[in-house]
Amino acid sequence: MAEEVARSFDDGLHLLVQAGTGTGKSLAYLVPSMLHHKRVVVATATLALQHQLVERDLPRLVEAIEHEQGVSSSYAVLKGRSNYACLHRIREGVPDDQGVLVDVPEGSMGKQVLELRAWAEEQAENDGTGERDHAPRHTDRLWRQVSVSARECLGRSRCAFGDECFAERARDRAAESQLVITNHSLLAIDAIEGVPMIPEYDVVVVDEAHEVTARITQAATDELSTGDVERAARRAQRWVEGSEADDLDDAAGALEGALAQSEPGRIDRIPADLADALVLVRDAARACLGAFPKEGEGDADAGRSQARAGVQEVFNHAERMAADLESDVLWRNDREPARGGPQLCVAPLQVWGPMRDKLLRDKTVVFTSATLMLGGDFSVVASSVGLKPSERIPTEPVGEVVDESSGPDEEVLPWRGIDVGSPFDYGKQAILYVARHLPSPGRNGLGKAQLDEIVELVDAAEGRTLGLFSSRRAAETAAEEVRARLPHLTTLAQGDAQLPELARQFVEDPHTCLFGTLSLWQGLDVPGDTCQLVLIDRIPFPRPDDPLMSARQRAADQSGGNGFMQVAATHAALLLAQGSGRLIRSTTDKGVVAVLDPRLVTARYGGFLKASLPPMWTTTDPAVVRKALARLASSAG
């Protein structure tokens, strides 16, 4: 893998690398990155991988190469501005709803804010990073009291604390480093949205690449609610002398009325009253922006800057939604009243086009993950990131690359794909059990047959079970059943405590079950006897009412493709592969992946899904599986 990555850097061809758990893929791209003659950016999806790179892999690599002549071992971590404490906000105060700077909130929240402020000042004194990940325990709401978004920031030259700023110092370190570690979202903002966030680079490694399209979609999703517009109007009232801020507040009322008349879910055709309300908000926000007093030289005021930023955000989101672009999907999302009530959301219908035009044409990109071959092939993932299957060339190039699907003016983007395998012998270490005898899952959650099956399997394994469920309700129902019928085991459900605490309990006591939803499907690494059974209640297709997925599926059908296979089955295959990957994490692990959904072996699409999984020995016989689990449990002790 290291040789192929280095070759890709040198010849400028894009590369997809499937590298199974345990192959050491991070070192396989970090070594060529250190040896490359220009800066390399590594983008990850999760904080856990960033921590692994920065706290484990890179220090070991630097120690190994520090005496090599002509090799730069410098590296830096770069995140979005809101991930760093803001010294201006900490020292000058936070704007309230009227834009007045308030020192500290009252009550217990005020005490926690003071703790965060003290931590940030200590970081500033000791040349710390001021990163959120290193801060004392806090909520999102608390963190907003000590941080700002990029739009709210005064800017280095206009801020009294610009030279001390944690975010600016992180950018300075990145500009002096050979290697920049960042995340998918920041990469998207820099490369696709064209907002310069990362120092100049020509090569990108996208790790956890199976996540990249979802993360880029997330970064390009905008939200707008009545509360957002009202808040922006209230903050603007202190700075705008005319009626423009009041007009914006009136527009919020029109939006509230139009939202109340609309239905939850995807909006294919914007109703006239909602379209009118969005235009009203857009125009009122534009007028309000024009009414803000101009800032003079050295006349920086955080309250004014942040009030204006709020109005600018409302304008941008309303303008995008009112445009009703075919390239966007609009929907109404219903939140609890305490969390703000209904909101409008807009997201790109697809991201492969922007990725191809804005990232792949300008940079050399290496995509890597343990899960890149879906249905046994790279084509699905390649297409999702903007590379055409017809542009793939053999690992050893032969002849000229020809893409017959490209027009005369369209640039061909050749790429290679390699699977470097796995150190694990899945055929001997793992069993895939499909409960063919069970009824297909219904809409009413887990039935008696599924609950009986879960209890029997968990009993045979004597705990040691990670349950991956399609909904929080299903996870909690299963947990209640196992607790009632197997009281000698410890059964934990997601939500009982914070995920790190649940994971710690799961590891410490082998006679434990941990049941949860999506964050457990991809974020848990538990090698050893702790986890010998991974339960999956149903094939994880997206919900039929998911606005974005359903729109993408319909668009694929309309373009002559198979929307179900291209969108729903691909989504399910990716999650199934990730979920199954929780079982075998080392060469000594053994266990069972149990799928309680018979469609994996009875439906036509089952072959595609199975081809996306590790090559485990497969059975549909429950007696065989229970005996295997009992043997594993007795040998584990």
Explain the meaning of each model-derived region.
Residues 1-17:
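Conserved pre-motif I regulatory segment
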Residues 144-178, 193-195, 288-436, 445-452, ...:
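A contiguous, basic/glycine-rich beta-loop/short-helix subdomain that forms a polymer-engagement track
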Residues 6-10, 26-39, 56-60:
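Walker A/P-loop NTP-binding motif
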Residues 423, 435-445, 496-601:
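Conserved RecA-like P-loop NTPase helicase motor core
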Residues 40-49, 366-370, 464-470, 594-596:
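Conserved RecA-like ASCE P-loop NTPase motor core of nucleic-acid helicases/translocases
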Residues 470-495:
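Conserved helicase motor "Helicase C" RecA-like lobe of SF1/SF2 P-loop NTPases
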Residues 21, 38-178, 283, 290-293, ...:
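A substrate-engagement module of RecA-like helicase motors
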Residues 35, 48-51, 55-59, 151-152, ...:
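Signature of the SF2 helicase/ATPase Hel1-core->accessory helical subdomain module
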